[in-house]
């Protein structure tokens, strides 16, 4: 077919089309990298009219979002977190981005009672002095700033998957284990 019109443009990445509401002439999509002050890997849900007008971010800033939309595109469940926050699930109105209700906030009380501490997110400049590099630092739970610790640079340089977790997931603790060793 022929291109009718461009719907989005900009120096950011569309990750996934979540839903096309043909009746309302709206597309919902996950994208990252729009906010230059935020980790560029945090996915956010947006809506935009099929003619390219009315672009609106529907999810909270500065979190990684995983969303599931209802079949009628009226609501979505937003599971959001970072590696240094407690995961939360909310029901959101898809037209406005307004919270309808909190569905669940994870209970970390036993983790914290056992000494768990969140990792630290950081941003540094690359050697070019321009490019921002984002990372996560895991420290021993009994970290002592007067001691010297080895650094483990946990990198996966392949194109298939990132080695860094952005939301708090079941995989997050595996990196914590290295810091505790």
Q: Could you say what each language-model-derived stretch is?
A:
Residues 1-23, 32-37, 48-65, 94-118, ...:
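Multi-bladed beta-propeller domains
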Residues 24, 64-181:
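Serine-hydrolase catalytic core recognition
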